[in-house]
């Protein structure tokens, strides 16, 4: 549904340009995250897109130790049937500005204050979760996601719920709760049969977890292959996951093939991380979340 008089709604992130999970911006700090995805909810004002003329905010998670993340421009996805009050429009517009400019502390502060005043507004909880993820506050991410899901009362669509669950899964992974993170990724995948990032998130953990009891190479390959198919083999971060999955299986030829494709199609900022992993595969070594 499209609203023509709202300036800007909110951003729901599942992966972030930060240092792991995706939320820590150093290249070495992101060893335990899975994939991430950024979705921005933006309305139109006076029939004209607010995204026009705005520089695209990029959120990457293909750091040295992380899994996939989609780089995405502003996208119009609105809660079906929701009627925004003037007060909500003002909050959404301010949050939209903060997210567009990566002002995560301001977004977190405002959303935290706002949910105390209006705990029934699920999209404020979702915005708080996104901001918390970018500030590397996984416990707050989980709390905010649970609150958003609990209070949406059917207002959130399937895409909203999928992204919330992926966001929570990444936070769980960040906290070292790998098995629970996998379960949450798979729950997100069942919510949206066509979402590649939930599948890639689970595949990343199955392929790269430090705990051998968690790793399942065959399952990782199956999930990563499906994620690659759903993304038409055009998302370098997912191809990177597929490479890690094959490496865990011991198929280093295919690991090199897919990592090479990730390098060819990846963003220039991410390529060094792909190249580093490729070096492991060329040496017949799988990638681990604690690899150096």
Task: Report the location of each language-model feature.
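Register position in tetratricopeptide repeats
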Residues: 100-101, 134-135, 174, 208, ...
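Residue-level recognition of tetratricopeptide repeat
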Residues: 96, 130, 170, 204-211, ...
């Amino acid at each position: 549904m499209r609203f023509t008089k709202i300036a800007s709604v909110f951003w729901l992130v599942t992966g972030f340009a930060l240092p792991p999970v995706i939320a820590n911006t150093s290249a070495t700090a992101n060893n335990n995250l899975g994939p991430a995805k950024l979705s921005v909810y933006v309305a139109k004002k006076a029939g004209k897109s607010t995204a026009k003329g705005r520089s695209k905010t990029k959120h990457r998670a293909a750091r040295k130790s992380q899994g996939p993340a989609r780089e995405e421009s502003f996208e119009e996805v609105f809660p079906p049937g929701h009627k925004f009050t003037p007060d909500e429009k003002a909050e959404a517009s301010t949050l939209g500005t903060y997210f567009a400019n990566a002002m995560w502390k301001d977004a977190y502060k405002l959303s935290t204050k706002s949910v105390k005043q209006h705990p029934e507004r699920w999209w404020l909880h979702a915005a708080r979760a996104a901001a918390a993820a970018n500030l590397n506050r996984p416990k707050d991410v989980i709390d905010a996601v649970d609150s958003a899901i609990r209070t949406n009362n059917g207002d959130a669509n399937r895409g909203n719920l999928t992204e919330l669950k992926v966001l929570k899964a990444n936070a769980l992974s960040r906290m070292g709760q790998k098995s629970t993170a996998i379960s949450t990724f798979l729950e997100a995948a069942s919510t949206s049969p066509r979402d590649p990032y939930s599948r890639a998130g689970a595949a990343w953990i199955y392929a790269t977890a430090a705990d051998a009891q968690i790793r399942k190479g065959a399952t990782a390959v199956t999930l990563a292959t499906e994620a690659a198919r759903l993304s038409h083999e055009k998302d370098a971060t997912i191809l990177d996951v597929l490479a890690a999955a094959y490496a865990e299986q011991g198929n280093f030829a295919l690991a090199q093939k897919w990592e090479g494709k990730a390098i060819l199609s990846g963003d220039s900022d991410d390529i060094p991380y792909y190249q580093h992993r490729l070096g492991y595969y060329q040496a017949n070594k799988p990638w681990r979340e604690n690899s150096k």
